[in-house]
């Protein structure tokens, strides 16, 4: 079976937004207009097609990014196609800050993105976070100012906020006609026509009109700004413009595309997905301005086993190249079992093919291959470069792994995942739950690399670690629903860390003589603090063979064995470096084990000598509140050991930014609701680790002693 759609007709894009900007509703409308779903699912009544986990439907927030394939051709009147049919692979991403990891994974495999803004709130904290992630992955994007029907909707304020908050240059390609309950449609600034939506057919039809007189001047002013930005993309167009010749419509579209792909500016359009207005303009813009796999530079990978990770193996969107793909998400499907969502970068994959997971050096075989629509699936026999598909039955593959042709191996990505900052103890209620819980936790951890499961050696408890209270709540909830595990959950605990405050040198000799072969090892270690966030490093500065090479791994193993449990309260030790500067050995009595024991004892002594101190996670907190509650909220944050960084106004609300220790933020949402009669909202994410004040450090040490 040959490729059905040429690559230039592919668009792999994601929809990214702050929680509540209307992402699921917008995706629903896209699926409805592109003919894939026949009844509109509203998040308000918990029936959206993309939100396929039961919980998402209850909580009304999107948790997992489902990948969907659908088709669209550009149309201006809703009836006449102006382009061939394009194939859209849409990845729905969550907007809640506890799920940033999901967004990170999906951005790694997207070519472009549609960023949704709430027309009233504009650029919100989570939008900024996701925007920065998209900048890091160099993802071109367009902006849809959604919810123009909301009270307080302000398109021009959103445009200004894009510039102020993200530093990007917004380029409106459409203006709303009216706002709030008077939203009639949009003005297309490229063709200079009005799109006026009619009637009850859920926005599937609209009328194209000339721009009404009272809006003509404003439309011309904004079109002028758009053209000035666009002609900067091309010298010839610039010269023609300076001579008084404006680009025609196809040229203007081509110039906007060029500017969008180079990220010189961001096209902005408007509407209301809920009121079925303006979504088709977004679909047209995806075709016109977002990249196809051919517009994206070749993906540079490195050879498996290359420690330097020199990226010198290109894989571009071409069926003739060797097969290479990235597994970016694992999901449990109640009918098919484990599904691995995979993006093909190059080559062709057929059912039954052998492939290699080059990240782990393991072989995998292609069983069932599926093209996913949010909840329905279509079995396929082969997939091509640029496709996003789901593979069933892979045994070894987890998120971020590369799958490739066994004869032409490459590793595409090393995804970095943040350290968890919050943990809870979980205990199964019955013996039967014990086994099910182990299986459930292993499955959930395979799906979500920002979630870790560990066993506390001393208490034997199972510890779940994650990115926030909501993150762990939802995982516990999924354990109950999907795996039918009943468990008791402990109170959330902070993931403290320990570090050192000064340099120290330790000379330690380990001797043991018990008849027969003894044990002997001497090590001299230099321990130094490093910059926050640098982690741990070890080097050997041994010259002249004072410690033979074969014993040095034992030294490092001994050092590492102490890192998991620091001297103050048994928390992991971070941000320090160790050098082995001298030592001594015995021809008969020395061994790797003897050096491991010596290094372990030296390290324990060294950490105490180097002034061990306790660190706690500090969260960046943003509270948005009506003005009358500002004073009380700031007072409350300060009482939680918070450092208020500043205030800002957004529309008619005040925005308070602060750094607050995580230990003092548990259950904050309830306090905030009662202080503000439910009108203030907050978001927080982990920012950095900082030293715990001495009096609190003493309390923590007593508690964990």
UniProtKB/Swiss-Prot annotation:
Residue stretches making up the tr-type G domain: 8-294
Gene Ontology cellular-component terms listed: cytoplasm
SMART domains linked: EFG_C, EFG_IV
Listed GO MF terms: GTP binding; GTPase activity; guanosine tetraphosphate binding; translation elongation factor activity
Keyword Nucleotide-binding: yes
GO BP annotation list: ribosome disassembly
Compartments (UniProt record): Cytoplasm
Entry keywords, A to Z: Cytoplasm, Elongation factor, GTP-binding, Nucleotide-binding, Protein biosynthesis
CDD domains: EF-G, EFG_III, EFG_mtEFG1_IV, EFG_mtEFG_C, EFG_mtEFG_II
Main location per the UniProt record: cytoplasm
Binding site for GTP: 17-24, 92-96, 146-149
Entry function: Catalyzes the GTP-dependent ribosomal translocation step during translation elongation. During this step, the ribosome changes from the pre-translocational (PRE) to the post-translocational (POST) state as the newly formed A-site-bound peptidyl-tRNA and P-site-bound deacylated tRNA move to the P and E sites, respectively. Catalyzes the coordinated movement of the two tRNA molecules, the mRNA and conformational changes in the ribosome.
Family: Belongs to the TRAFAC class translation factor GTPase superfamily. Classic translation factor GTPase family. EF-G/EF-2 subfamily.
Name of protein: Elongation factor G
Organism: Cereibacter sphaeroides (strain ATCC 17025 / ATH 2.4.3) (Rhodobacter sphaeroides)
Phylogenetic lineage: Bacteria, Pseudomonadati, Pseudomonadota, Alphaproteobacteria, Rhodobacterales
Gene name, Swiss-Prot/TrEMBL: fusA
């Amino acid at each position: 079976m040959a490729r059905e759609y040429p690559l230039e007709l592919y668009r792999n894009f994601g929809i990214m937004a702050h929680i509540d900007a209307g992402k699921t509703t917008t995706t629903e409308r896209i699926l409805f207009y592109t003919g894939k779903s026949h009844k509109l699912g509203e998040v308000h009544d918990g029936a959206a097609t993309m939100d396929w986990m039961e919980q998402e439907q209850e909580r009304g927030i999107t948790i997992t990014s489902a990948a969907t394939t659908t088709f669209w051709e550009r149309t201006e009147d809703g009836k006449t196609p102006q382009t061939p049919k394009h194939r859209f692979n849409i990845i729905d991403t969550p907007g809640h800050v506890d799920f940033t990891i999901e967004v990170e994974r999906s951005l790694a495999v997207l070519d472009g993105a549609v960023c949704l803004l709430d027309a009233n709130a504009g650029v919100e904290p989570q939008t900024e976070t996701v925007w920065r992630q998209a900048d890091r992955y160099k993802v071109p994007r367009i902006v849809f100012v959604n919810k123009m029907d909301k009270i307080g909707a302000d398109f021009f304020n959103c445009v200004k906020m894009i510039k102020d908050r993200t530093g990007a240059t917004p380029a409106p390609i459409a203006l709303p006609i009216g706002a709030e309950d008077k939203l009639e449609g949009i003005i297309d600034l490229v063709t200079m026509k009005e799109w006026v939506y009619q009637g009850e057919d859920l926005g599937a039809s609209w009328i194209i009109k000339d721009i009404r007189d009272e809006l003509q001047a404003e439309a011309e002013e904004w079109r002028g700004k758009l053209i000035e930005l666009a002609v900067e993309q091309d010298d010839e167009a610039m010269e023609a413009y300076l001579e008084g010749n404006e680009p025609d419509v196809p040229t203007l579209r081509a110039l906007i595309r060029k500017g969008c792909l180079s990220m010189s500016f961001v096209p902005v359009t408007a509407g209301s997905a809920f009121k079925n207005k303006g979504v088709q303009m977004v679909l047209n813009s995806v075709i016109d301005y977002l990249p196809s796999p051919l517009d994206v530079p070749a993906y540079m990978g490195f050879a498996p086993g290359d420690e330097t990770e020199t990226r010198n193996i290109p894989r571009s969107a071409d069926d003739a190249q060797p097969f290479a793909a990235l597994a970016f998400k694992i999901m449990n499907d109640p009918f098919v079992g484990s599904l691995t969502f995979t993006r093909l970068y190059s080559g062709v994959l057929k059912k039954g093919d052998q492939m290699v997971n080059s990240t782990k050096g393991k072989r995998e075989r292609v069983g069932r291959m599926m093209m996913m629509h949010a909840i329905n699936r279509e079995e396929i026999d082969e997939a091509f470069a640029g496709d996003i598909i789901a593979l069933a039955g892979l045994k070894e593959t987890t998120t971020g792994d590369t799958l490739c042709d066994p004869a032409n191996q490459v590793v595409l990505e090393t995804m970095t995942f943040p350290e968890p900052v919050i943990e809870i103890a979980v205990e199964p209620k019955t013996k039967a739950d014990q086994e099910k819980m182990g299986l459930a936790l292993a499955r959930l951890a395979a799906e979500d690399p920002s979630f870790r499961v560990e066993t506390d050696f001393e208490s034997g408890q199972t510890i779940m670690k994650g990115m926030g209270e909501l993150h762990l709540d939802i995982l516990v909830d999924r354990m109950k629903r999907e795996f039918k595990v009943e468990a008791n959950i402990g109170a959330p605990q902070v993931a403290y860390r320990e570090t050192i405050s000064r340099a120290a040198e330790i000379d330690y000799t380990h001797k043991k003589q018990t008849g027969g072969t003894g044990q002997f090892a001497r090590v001299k270690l230099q321990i130094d603090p490093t910059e926050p966030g640098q982690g741990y490093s070890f080097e050997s500065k041994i010259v002249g063979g004072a410690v033979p090479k074969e014993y040095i791994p034992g030294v490092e193993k001994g050092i590492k064995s102490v890192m998991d449990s620091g001297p103050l309260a048994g928390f992991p030790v971070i941000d320090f470096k160790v050098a082995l500067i001298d030592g001594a050995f015995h021809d008969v009595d020395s061994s790797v084990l003897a050096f491991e024991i010596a290094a372990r004892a030296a390290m324990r002594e060294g950490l105490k000598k180097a002034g061990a101190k306790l660190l706690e996670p500090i969260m960046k907190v943003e509270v948005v509140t009506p003005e009358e509650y500002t004073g009380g909220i700031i007072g409350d944050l300060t009482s939680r050991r918070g450092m208020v960084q500043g205030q800002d106004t957004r529309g008619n609300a005040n925005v308070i930014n602060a750094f607050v220790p995580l230990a003092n933020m548990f259950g904050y949402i309830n306090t905030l609701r009662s202080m503000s009669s439910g009108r203030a909202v907050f978001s927080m994410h982990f920012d950095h680790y900082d030293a715990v004040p001495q009096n609190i450090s003493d309390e923590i040490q007593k508690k964990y002693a």
